[in-house]
Curated annotation (Swiss-Prot):
One of its GO terms (molecular function) is DNA binding. Gene3D superfamilies: 3.40.1360.10, 6.10.250.240, RecR Domain 1 (1.10.8.420). GO terms for biological process: DNA recombination; DNA repair. The gene is recR. It holds the Pfam family Toprim_4. May play a role in DNA repair. It seems to be involved in an RecBC-independent recombinational process of DNA repair. It may act with RecF and RecO. It comes from the Bacteria. It comes from Burkholderia cenocepacia (strain HI2424). This is Recombination protein RecR. A zinc finger (C4-type) spans 57-72. Residues 80-175 form the Toprim domain. Keywords: DNA damage, DNA recombination, DNA repair, Metal-binding, Zinc, Zinc-finger. Signal peptide: none annotated. SMART domains: TOPRIM (SM00493). CDD domains: TOPRIM_recR.
């Protein structure tokens, strides 16, 4: 039996999410249509609202509804510290630890030459300009401890150190192969407090 085109379109749309294959997408689509149409409508409205209103912060590249995000606008933050993370989810996890009071730069990815992701795709030039503004004294590399995250940290560290900046890396409280988004706040807090010079 061929499924209705509207259901097929919904299944395909759900497959854009990371880790969602055809069977999971099918289950989600059927669940929404059969058991939670109100939830489906809310999801649709929220996605539309987010795509229309979210943009990248002009300073740190995270998602925001304004030109400059709340963190970059906070005059209580230490502008001499710049923490580099891969994703907004990583930034949120670090903020939840309440151990870091500097500013951020969000790469929106990590180096992965096999996937065609190089320095341009992770906004490397913007990061270098931000870190070299004469205010930043220390750059904290908080990329994930995956192979790509380590390669990204190494590349960024070498380049930023060559510009005379102090570069530190989160300590190894975060498990090797771990991603910040999935690590508990206590572990991230310890890693931030025990960061080391590269």
């Amino acid at each position: 039996m061929k499924q209705p085109s509207a259901l097929s379109a919904l299944v395909e749309a759900l497959r854009v999410l990371p880790g969602v294959g055809p069977k999971s997408a099918q289950r989600m689509a059927v669940h929404l249509m059969q058991h939670d149409r109100e939830g489906a409508e809310r999801l649709g409205r929220s996605l539309l609202f987010a795509t229309e209103h979210l943009q990248h912060c002009e300073k740190c590249n995270t998602f925001t509804e304004a030109q400059i995000c709340e963190v970059c606008s906070d005059e209580e933050r230490d502008p001499t510290l710049l923490c580099v993370v891969e994703t907004p989810a990583d930034q949120i996890m670090l903020e939840q630890t309440m151990t870091y009071r500097g500013l951020y730069f969000v790469l929106m990815g990590r180096l992965s030459p096999l996937d065609g992701i190089g320095p341009k795709e992770i906004h490397f030039d913007r990061l270098v300009r931000r870190a070299s503004d004469g205010v930043v004294k220390e750059v904290v590399l908080a990329t994930n401890f995956t192979n790509e995250g380590e390669a990204t940290a190494h590349y960024l560290g070498q380049t930023l150190k060559a510009r005379g900046l102090a570069v530190t890396r989160l300590a190894r409280g975060v498990p090797v192969g771990g991603e910040l988004e999935y690590v508990d706040a206590g572990t991230i807090a310890r890693a931030m407090l025990d960061r080391r010079t590269m």
